[in-house]
Amino acid sequence: MSSTGVKTMKDFMLNKSNIRNMCVIAHVDHGKSTLTDSLVTLAGIISNEKAGVARYTDTRPDEQERCITIKSTSISMYYEIEDKEDIPADANGNGFLINLIDSPGHVDFSSEVTAALRVTDGALVVVDCVEGVCVQTETVLRQALTERVKPIVIINKVDRVILELKEEPEEAYQSFCRSIENVNVLISTYKDELLGDVQVSPGEGTVAFGSGLHGWAFTLEKFAKMWSAKFGIDRKRMLEKLWGDNYWDAKAKKWKKNGKGDHGEVLQRGFVQFCFDPITKLFNAIMEGRKADYEKMLTNLQIKLSADDKEKEGKELLKTVMKLWLPAGVTLLEMIVLHLPSPVVAQKYRTSNLYTGPMDDEAAKAMANCDEKGPLMMYVSKMIPTNDKGRFYAFGRVFSGTIRTGGKARICGPNYVPGKKDDCVIKNIQRTMLMMGRYTDPIDECPCGNVIGLVGVDQYLLKSGTITDSVAHIIKDMKFSVSPVVRVAVETKNPSDLPKLVEGMKRLSRSDPLCLCYTEESGEHIVAGAGELHLEVCLKELQEDYCSGVPLIVTEPVVSFRETITEPSRIQCLSKSANNQNRLFMRAFPFPEGLAEDIEAGEIKPDTDFKERAKFLSEKYGWDVDEARKIWCFGPDNCGPNLFVDVTKGIQYLNEVKDSIVNGFNNAMHDGVVCNEQIRGVRINLEDVKLHADAIHRGGAQMIPCARRCCFACVLTGAPSLLEPMYLAEIQCPESAIGGIYTVMSRRRGKIISEEQRPGTPLFNVRAYLPVCESFGFTADLRSHTSGQAFPQCVFDHWQLLNGDVTDATSKVGSIVAAIRKRKGLPEGVPGLDKFYDKL
């Protein structure tokens, strides 16, 4: 297989049944980019020697320096299946176009994974066979299943089991089994009815084993072919015996289920005897330098070494031999082609999850059928910087229709509502580009089922959006598993450079799916990210790429808190409008546990049918059904984890002031009364309203501030407190380092929740909760206390209530409130109730 020209690529793009859109996902350092190299080698893009070392899809200098992937990178390649028996039934010919996206594994960049999953139909999940399924494996797999993306698995770093841990073959089998079982537990936990059962099993060919660094991999299919040809038996029968409790009794010449021979001798299971043993024997012969032994094995395997290769020894020779015998690229590409769906298959069950409009309209039908003649529907999931500073390719997937260079299209942002003109422009597409890792190639048009980059769209979209050619609903915006909770204020050393900073922040906001850039009312310029590393990368980009190297001053990182209440308002709160002609009576209640999380997870949404919503709230949280039907608003921003409920009866003119009251509620929830942080987990009941009969006296200018003040009064009478964000830290270390972990955790208000040894390894898995505000410098601190043996990975987990009185400056929560108020330039001390609560 050679590098394929753009012209040939176009022909493949039309053959929808033979396209595979897939991404590589895993925990950090489990070997995604290294494995991707094996696939890229097959496409003839890098040489065989460089595979596993080049990390071709790590295109940025900082990715090569840090040895981690920061941005997801797309590459298209072509593969032909040689064995006609293996071609899938719905395929059209034996040539396949594979659009692969390599994604980051570090939790701080998991928004990049979400963007990659949105435009793909399948995912290759990489699991380190020593470390097993880790916290980020769980996160990315959950995201994949939420997007209805079908997973297949590769158990990576198998060479470590043989060379480092020197495990017995049976132990290795049990270790692989545990990892596969853990993946299947996650798949069944987050399963989706429409996606169907996507559990993985080596016997079905959906699990491979290999080593990305050494460039080899195999599925059981490979050995089934080899042994069935040798013994002259049916390939499928052989395949069934290579996994599970199947033991070959050579004397009796039959398979047993119990591992004991007729005379009580211990039998080896099929996987060990026919798959793992040959590999282990070859490994040992080469590493121990037993030339006669391994040359005999190579002859049996029909592997011919070149004169140069014969000179090699040890690991170098091992790599060469294994790449020739079990090339990872071929194994993985076959697995991708055979077990991942084409756009034609996948879009049938993915459309209902993606399209926001009715499922029987023209756009939805075209998406479900992947119809290139239907209306254009494309989702832009991220922006990729071009060589032209400050400009971006809009990268996305065409779900129906065909997008053409120079064609007119409607570019709609995530807030577009059909029938309205906001957040939508009609413009020409300047160019369509094939994204090829480090390079791009212009192309005239791109039919549905493919991923593509667009030039000239970046001016009209911030981060993501939908591109159509007719009036249609938009494709649902992405939901990220992390939130930007760590932020810094940025300013320029030289005030005259301020316009460059503002422009740079706009560009940074575009380039990163998650990064938030905004200006506070106090005039501070804020950049917010998911964690310390994410923020560091964003700030480096901001200074070097988007602000032309302007010197910047960056404050210490600050963490976002949330305000809440801990008990119902002790009195009914009354606020009057400025003209004293209107009165609002409200009361606040804290959410029952779990409701805020349900709202954020989308279990109940503002657009859910009100009867369904009421049923859910009454059954799960014991709400009164009538009250649950009268939810006016979720806040802030009409979608947050707070609710405004109308419990009044028969109030005249109430509908006329509804918008103003909702507006006031949203304002109050966005900037809380305690320290201007967002409010979370509060339900506000509107209990009574007295309105002036004349509409001119109850306009927005009167009612919005009145509603806001009343909400604040309710919060102040409900024992207000703060919620701080907590990380779930997963730390892998040997037993000797556990003491150091406890020391660091206790110093940082952390709480260890579990520690367990990974069976068959000397490693311990320690899980702990760590406050985000205590996490700065945590990794360096931990490494210095454990002599560099502990590797932490922190994922945002939940919001934790801080105990104490917010008005008492000597308590922990009081001192945090005082510090936040001082930083924001607010008056000292929490405002008193008399500022918001009016007397009758």
UniProtKB/Swiss-Prot annotation:
One GO cellular component assignment for this chain's record is: cytosol
Keyword Metal-binding in the entry? The reply is no
Q: What keywords would UniProt list here?
A: Cytoplasm, Elongation factor, GTP-binding, Hydrolase, Nucleotide-binding, Phosphoprotein, Protein biosynthesis
**Localization of this protein:** Cytoplasm
| EC numbers for this chain | 3.6.5.-
Q: PTMs?
A: Phosphorylation by EF-2 kinase completely inactivates EF-2.
The record's listing under SMART domains reads: EFG_C, EFG_IV
Post-translational modification Phosphothreonine, affected residues? 57, 59
Q: What is its main location?
A: cytoplasm
What GO molecular function terms would the record report? GTP binding; GTPase activity; ribosome binding; translation elongation factor activity
Q: Name one Pfam family in it.
A: GTP_EFTU_D2
Which annotated residues bind GTP?
26-33, 156-159, 211-213
CDD domains per UniProt: aeEF2_snRNP_like_IV (cd01681), eEF2_snRNP_like_C (cd04096), EF2 (cd01885), EF2_II (cd16268), EF2_snRNP_III (cd16261)
Every copy of the tr-type G domain together lies at: 17-251
What is catalyzed by this enzyme?
GTP + H2O = GDP + phosphate + H(+)
Q: Does the keyword Nucleotide-binding apply?
A: yes
Q: Which InterPro entries match?
A: EFG_II, EFG_III/V, EFG_V-like, EFTu-like_2, G_TR_CS, P-loop_NTPase, Ribosomal_Su5_D2-typ_SF, Ribsml_uS5_D2-typ_fold_subgr
Q: What does this protein do?
A: Catalyzes the GTP-dependent ribosomal translocation step during translation elongation. During this step, the ribosome changes from the pre-translocational (PRE) to the post-translocational (POST) state as the newly formed A-site-bound peptidyl-tRNA and P-site-bound deacylated tRNA move to the P and E sites, respectively. Catalyzes the coordinated movement of the two tRNA molecules, the mRNA and conformational changes in the ribosome.
Q: Which family does it belong to?
A: Belongs to the TRAFAC class translation factor GTPase superfamily. Classic translation factor GTPase family. EF-G/EF-2 subfamily.
Q: Output the PANTHER family linked to this UniProt entry.
A: EUKARYOTIC TRANSLATION ELONGATION FACTOR 2, TRANSLATION ELONGATION FACTOR-RELATED
Q: What is this protein called?
A: Elongation factor 2
Could you tell me which species this protein originates from?
A: Entamoeba histolytica
Gene this protein is translated from: EF-2
